[in-house]
From Swiss-Prot:
InterPro entries: GrpE (IPR000740), GrpE_coiled_coil (IPR013805), GrpE_head (IPR009012). Coiled coil: none annotated. The gene is grpE. Keywords: Chaperone, Cytoplasm, Stress response. This is Protein GrpE. GO terms for molecular function: adenyl-nucleotide exchange factor activity; protein homodimerization activity; protein-folding chaperone binding; unfolded protein binding. Gene3D superfamilies: 3.90.20.20, Head domain of nucleotide exchange factor GrpE (2.30.22.10). Homodimer. It holds the Pfam family GrpE. It comes from the Bacteria. Residues 1-44 are annotated as: Disordered. The keyword Cytoplasm applies. It is found in: Cytoplasm.
């Protein structure tokens, strides 16, 4: 019986050794199987990380473009507002210029009696006040006679030959031109020397 017991113990020991060997082999196989799985998972995580970084960079670039667009919009709006303020009176001044021309023509009359002289003096005073008010608003008359012809400031309606003037010089002003600050409201209508 002792021999049987010894055999049983040996069998149990062998079974235990076999089980341990199988367990060790299974663990090794699992570890080997896990290693590629871990590598695959690492590669997958790295790929996801790279994609997320690219998306983040894309979003940051988009945000920078939106911010730049917004800054440009604010700058344009500010410039438009400044221009609107600077030239706010342009329309009414443009409408007043023909009346001013007629007023200046009326001042050209030759007074034949004392009453007409008095009226002319009053009109000259009003004319000076109108010109002063326009000057305060930033309106200036465009210089013409004797100046070089500038297509931005002058409108040539005739060409003449006059030795007293240089070539391409304005000889005569037919209608006054005006600027509002740096913008031409109406160009001077002129005769130009050839």
């Amino acid at each position: 019986m002792a021999e049987e017991k010894q055999n049983e113990e040996l069998n149990e020991q062998e079974e235990l050794n076999e089980t341990e060997a199988e367990t060790a082999e299974a663990e090794q196989t699992a570890a080997e199987a896990d290693a590629p799985a871990e590598e695959t998972q690492t590669e997958m995580l790295e790929k996801q990380l790279k994609e997320l970084q690219e998306r983040l960079e894309e979003k940051e670039n988009k945000l920078l473009r939106v911010q730049a667009d917004f800054e440009n919009y604010k700058r344009r709006a500010r410039l438009d507002l400044e221009a609107a303020e600077k030239y706010r009176s342009q329309r009414i001044i443009s409408d007043l210029l023909p009346a001013l021309d007629n007023f200046e023509r009326a001042l050209q009359i030759d007074p034949d009696n004392e009453q007409t002289k008095s009226l002319l003096q009053g009109m000259e005073m009003v004319h000076r006040q109108i010109l002063e008010a326009l000057k305060n608003e930033g309106v200036e008359q465009i210089p013409s006679v004797g100046e070089q012809f500038d297509p931005n400031m002058h409108q040539a309606v005739m060409q003449v030959e006059d030795e007293a003037y240089e070539s391409n010089a304005v000889v005569e002003e037919l209608q006054k031109g005006y600027k509002l600050k740096d913008r031409v409201i109406r160009p001077s209508m002129v005769k130009v020397n050839q």
